[in-house]
Amino acid sequence: MIGNPVIQVPSSLMPSSSMIACPRVSPNGVPYLPPKPRTRHLVVRAASNSDAAHGQPSSDGGKNPLTVVLDVPRNIWRQTLKPLSDFGFGKRSIWEGGVGLFIVSGATLLALSWAWLRGFQMRSKFRKYQTVFELSHASGICTGTPVRIRGVTVGTIIRVNPSLKNIEAVAEIEDDKIIIPRNSLVEVNQSGLLMETMIDIMPRNPIPEPSVGPLHPECGKEGLIVCDRQTIKGVQGVSLDELVGIFTRIGREVEAIGVANTYSLAERAASVIEEARPLLKKIQAMAEDAQPLLSEFRDSGLLKEVECLTRSLTQASDDLRKVNSSIMTPENTELIQKSIYTLVYTLKNVESISSDILGFTGDEATRKNLKLLIKSLSRLL
């Protein structure tokens, strides 16, 4: 048999006791017909052995591998639902139970997360400590102002206590491992485009090495760091308000000086101009007198003579340069050096002879004898 013919058999043709139409009577005595029977179609497939043998491999071979992979969880789900359906758990009840389980698990996870966050906050709260900065001017310090150590934010201002004497800014440091040395420089600075106020802490040398933290009871005895709720003094750093005040004072002083001295300066300038007028007249007269002299000097041949003299000096310098180059040849230079060496040697000999003569004539007895000899010779002559 070729193919898989389908034979539809109406269920109405099948023998059934319900197919016998019997008139029925209602309780009030009115007869009525029985309900129309529902027709059911049964599908019967006929297949040969050969088709059954070859049909399965062909259907499996034509499936997409992705479809096969996606069918695996579906088949697992179906296999899981079968035993549950035997105990009265339908598909709807399973979905409702899954939704309820999801809601319960989500609520449990949310509660655990909230408990963990609260525990973390409580643990971090026990590790924080407070310090008080004593300042002469607030300079915009308010709740939330950052506190920095070497440019790193380590805490914030939680409260500001103003008074007529000073300002006390209470800061909360985030971790007790962050210490503030006693010798630190605390400044209130304003920086940035919006001139944000911040408290900068700059530790100075020598950097302390405490053995206990700021929350330890023995912290105050060491005196190396700022302990919990202790006070440290601060100074005013870069302040926009102070800069504006300085420029305002300078402007007022300049304005006062300018208004006071403008009139006196104008009077002095006028007096100087009046005193300079005779001098200007004299300069003008001298210029008029010098103009004829300049014209005569220009018309005379003095300029030409000066030019000739300059040319003569130039030629003389050229001649001297040539003579120098002709005389100071390497041979002449060597001869001059030898002559200088000979002269030096001769002078040394003369010096030795003169020293000998000086040593001979330097004796008193020799001088007397020479005088007597000269006198005797003069008598003989």
From Swiss-Prot:
Keyword presence, Chloroplast: yes
Subunit arrangement? Homomultimer. Substrate-binding subunit of the TGD complex, a lipid translocator at the inner chloroplast envelope membrane made of TGD1, TGD2 and TGD3. Interacts with TGD1 and TGD3 with an overall subunit stoichiometry of 2 TGD1, 2 TGD3 and 8 to 12 TGD2. Interacts with TGD5.
Pfam families found in the cross-reference section: MlaD
Q: What keywords would UniProt list here?
A: Chloroplast, Lipid transport, Membrane, Plastid, Plastid inner membrane, Transit peptide, Transmembrane, Transmembrane helix, Transport
Q: What is known of its domains?
A: Amino acids 201-225 are sufficient for specific binding of phosphatidic acid.
User: Chloroplast intermembrane side: which ranges?
Assistant: 118-381
What function is annotated for this protein?
A: Component of a phosphatidic acid/lipid transport complex in the chloroplast envelope. Specifically binds phosphatidic acid (PA). Involved in lipid transfer from the endoplasmic reticulum (ER) to plastids, and necessary for thylakoids formation.
Q: What is the effect of changing G192S?
A: In tgd2-5; accumulation of trigalactosyldiacylglycerol
Q: Which domain of life is it from?
A: Eukaryota
Q: Which ranges sit in the Stromal compartment?
A: 46-96
Q: Which GO terms describe its biological process?
A: intracellular lipid transport; lipid transport
Query: What InterPro entries does its record include?
Result: Mce/MlaD, TGD2-like
Subcellular localization is given as: Plastid, Chloroplast inner membrane
Bilayer disposition of the protein: Single-pass membrane protein
Gene Ontology molecular-function annotations: lipid transporter activity; phospholipid binding
Gene Ontology cellular component annotations, sorted alphabetically: chloroplast; chloroplast envelope; chloroplast inner membrane; cytosol; plastid
Q: What is the effect of changing G251E?
A: In tgd2-4; accumulation of trigalactosyldiacylglycerol
Would I find tRNA-binding among this entry's keywords?
no
Q: What is the name listed in the Swiss-Prot or TrEMBL entry for this protein?
A: Protein TRIGALACTOSYLDIACYLGLYCEROL 2, chloroplastic
TM annotation in the entry: 97-117
Q: Where is the transit peptide?
A: 1-45
